């Protein structure tokens, strides 16, 4: 897939300068975004490749205008909408507007860490 996510060697963006001792998460919301994506993968029925595609398959302006974990949330929204787990209206309202999809089993809290390690 060729897109904004695959910009290795593109001129005009400058070098990638890693932070010394850079943390995995710069703030708590990033940690939560990562956990949400992992926790929803089983009930949503997608894998890491599908999740990555949902993050990366977006218009260049959208992709370049978001931070790393904002892309994770945008990808999660896409996957959840595609599978009927949530509607765009519910995301915009920030609350549930309809009964949940039947037969969707949430991941148990104790299963999240093993899921991350896979």
Per-segment meaning from a language model:
Residues 1-118:
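A charge-rich, low-complexity, intrinsically flexible signal that marks solvent-exposed coils, linkers
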């Amino acid at each position: 897939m060729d897109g904004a996510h695959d910009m290795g060697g593109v001129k005009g963006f400058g070098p990638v300068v890693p932070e010394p001792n850079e943390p995995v998460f710069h703030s708590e919301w990033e940690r939560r975004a990562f956990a949400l994506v992992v926790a929803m993968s089983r009930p949503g029925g997608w894998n890491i490749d599908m999740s990555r595609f949902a993050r990366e398959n977006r218009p260049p302006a959208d992709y370049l205008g978001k931070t790393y974990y904002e892309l994770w949330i945008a990808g999660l929204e896409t996957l959840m909408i595609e599978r009927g787990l949530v509607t765009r209206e519910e995301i915009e309202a920030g609350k549930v507007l309809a009964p949940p999809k039947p037969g969707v089993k949430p991941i148990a809290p104790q299963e999240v860490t093993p899921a991350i390690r896979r």
